[in-house]
From Swiss-Prot:
Protein's name in the database: Chaperone protein DnaK2
Chain positions found as Phosphothreonine: 198
Database matches in Pfam families: HSP70
Compositionally biased intervals (Low complexity): 604-618
Length: 636
């Protein structure tokens, strides 16, 4: 089994790690950074850009640069109406109600899974270069509060990227693995994970290699992006009051505002106020307009007060579900870049009555934990037992539109549970099973994971047939449902239809497209490399001919200059076929010139040339040929 990497696929940034010599190592990307922006851009010339290079060009190319895509993955369009308006690119609904991201540069629409797959592909490629071997297997983390659809969609993204996803693991659980790997004493810890787009709280018992999740809670609509949005709205509102222009309606201005807001938020974690300067943010008939203001930490905390208050709700819920007292918590572990916000740290301290532990790197700890789990699955790490839970209740819709729970939230996984149901009317020959996930009493208020039918039930009075419905959650937290007529033994077993927004045929198409794109990308890279080599060869040829001057035979010089001219034209016209033809010809001429020069030098040296015969030079061996010489020491 090859190396299994651990990947934290984040909303804002992603990170990859691996076990080396029994210790987890975070792998730097090709640009030298330990985290990679979860950003994918498509340039007008068709080039696909991923990571830092994509983020850098976002202001100039907002409509084709995709970020915060994790907030859309595995969701229907009706679930993301607010988030869809907060990004500079176009988020649209397809004919099935699924989310699509419009890309004018490519003339097509992407599923969120396709964009996430590009980020995963870069992380795995960078890991492969670091390890010196091809990486094909990974453990990928997801927010603990991700539902079944979002988990399946994340797994699909891995498949599109050409990765075998061995395990989907919850982010707070991964963080606890990294925190507690070397801990011998038993501890009860609370992991407070506030990332770029999601928020999770998990309470675990950790010690002697056992990591047991007692309870988890969260909010998949709360993260650093929301804090950025508050700053954007504040700045845009103030500008609109002064100038009468809403900057949020201009995609380029919105992108600049978003980047400035993120920068200001980060700076306010260390200083009490920060300057925000955006020259030429827009223009009117009167000329260009500039945004120049100061934002204080106090004002930032004021405009984000509702978000900070929301951080407390999942904490209280998790403590209640774990059935423990706050005083029983030994450590509070902060995870995610947004936990650097002082007001967030203060609310944690206020609710739990103790200072949080800041001994882990909030940007890397989740990937480190995923790498440890990868080590467990590959057999490299021994004596670790991970007991995670299902974050939300699972059940079916029953008579009257009620949700009947089969697996309550915070049930340890993997798990399998069954309930027996019957028909609602006389002579009913089939039943429709509507699978739900959530905590509300009525079916319509919960997340619909899909429906399926069990046919062929023999006619009987209502209440007589016995239909056994079995829910089976695997270690990834992904659900399979089976319905069986106990009278006839007929069975219908499915992986939830609708659990993923992408059908298998669509995923397979995207996998093939990604593979063909990978080949095209490789070919494009090879062309660029050849062009660069040709540039370098032209420079070397011109330099060599100039330096050698008259030593170059006239015929060779004329031939070389002609080939240099041809190669320059091929490079300027990006004629790859011509480059491949001319470059070896020029190299051969240069070899010939170099060879002739050395032969000429040897001929001019005559008998004194090295190796010119037995009488050439002086012998260093013993015998009469030794020449004794006396040297006078210079006067000092």
């Amino acid at each position: 089994m090859g190396k299994v990497v651990g990947i934290d696929l984040g909303t804002t940034n992603s990170c990859v790690a691996v076990m080396e010599g029994g210790k987890p190592t975070v792998i730097a990307n090709a640009e030298g950074f330990r985290t990679t922006p979860s950003v994918v851009g498509y340039a007008k010339n068709g080039d696909r850009l991923v990571g830092q290079i994509a983020k850098r060009q976002a202001v100039m190319n907002p409509g084709n640069t995709f970020y915060s895509v994790k907030r859309f993955i595995g969701r229907k369009f009706d679930e993301i109406t607010n988030e869809a308006t907060e990004v500079a690119y176009s988020v649209v609904k397809d004919g099935n109600g699924n989310v699509k991201l419009d890309c004018p540069a490519q003339g097509k629409q992407f599923a969120p899974e396709e964009i996430s797959a590009q980020v995963l592909r870069k992380l795995v490629d960078d890991a492969s270069k670091y390890l010196g071997e091809t990486v094909t297997q990974a453990v990928i983390t997801v927010p603990a509060y991700f539902n079944d659809s979002q988990r399946q969609a994340t797994k699909d993204a891995g498949k599109i990227a050409g990765i075998e996803v061995l395990r989907i693991i919850n982010e707070p659980t991964a963080a606890s693995l990294a925190y507690g790997l070397d801990k011998k004493d038993n501890e009860t810890i609370l992991v407070f994970d506030l990332g770029g787009g999601t928020f999770d709280v998990s309470i675990l018992e950790v010690g002697e290699g056992v990591f047991e999740v007692l309870a988890t809670s969260g909010d998949t609509h709360l993260g650093g992006d929301d804090f950025d949005k508050k700053i954007v709205d504040f700045l845009a509102g103030e500008f609109q009051k002064a100038e009468g222009i809403d900057l949020r309606k201009d995609k380029q201005a919105l992108q600049r505002l978003t980047e400035a807001a993120e920068k200001a938020k980060i700076e306010l974690s260390g200083v009490s106020q920060t300057e925000i300067n955006l020259p030429f943010i827009t223009a009117t008939q009167d000329g260009p307009k500039h945004l120049d203001t100061t934002l204080s930490r106090a004002k930032f905390e004021e405009i984000c007060s509702d978000l900070i208050d929301r951080c407390g709700i999942p904490v209280e819920n998790a403590i209640r579900d774990a059935k423990i007292d706050k005083s029983a918590l030994d450590e509070i572990v902060l995870v995610g870049g947004s936990t650097r916000i002082p007001a967030v740290q203060e609310v944690v301290k206020k609710i739990l009555g103790k200072d949080p532990n800041q001994g882990v790197n909030p940007d890397e700890v989740v990937a480190v934990g995923a790498a440890i789990q990868g080590g467990v699955l590959s057999g490299e790490v021994k004596d670790i037992l991970l007991l995670d839970v299902s974050p939300l209740s699972l059940g079916v819709e029953t008579l009257g539109g009620v949700m009947t729970k089969i697996i309550p939230r915070n049930t340890t996984i993997p798990t399998k549970k069954s309930e027996t149901f019957s028909t609602a009317v006389d002579g009913q020959s089939n039943v429709e099973i509507h699978v739900l996930q959530g905590e509300r009493e009525m079916a319509n208020d919960n997340k619909s994971l899909g429906t399926f039918r069990l046919d062929g039930i023999p006619p009987a009075p209502r209440g007589v047939p016995q239909i056994e419905v079995t829910f089976d959650i695997d270690a990834n937290g992904i659900l399979n449902v089976t319905a069986k007529d106990r009278g006839t033994g007929k069975e219908q077993s499915i992986s939830i239809t609708g659990a993923s927004t992408l059908p298998d045929t669509e995923v397979d198409r995207m996998v093939k497209e990604a593979e063909s794109n990978a080949a095209a990308d490789k070919e494009r890279r090879e062309k660029i490399d050849r062009k660069n080599q040709a540039d370098s060869l032209v420079y070397q040829a011109e330099k060599q001919i100039t330096e050698l001057g008259d030593k170059v035979p006239a015929a060779d010089k004329i031939k070389a200059e002609g080939l240099i001219k041809d190669l320059k034209e091929a490079v300027a016209q990006e004629d790859d076929a011509k480059i491949q033809t001319v470059m070896p010809e020029l190299q051969q001429v240069l070899y010939s010139i170099g060879s002739n020069m050395y032969q000429q030098a040897g001929a001019e040296a005559g008998v004194g040339a090295p190796g010119a015969g037995p009488e050439a030079g002086t012998s260093s061996g013993g015998g009469d040929d030794v020449i004794d010489a006396e040297f006078s020491e210079p006067e000092k």
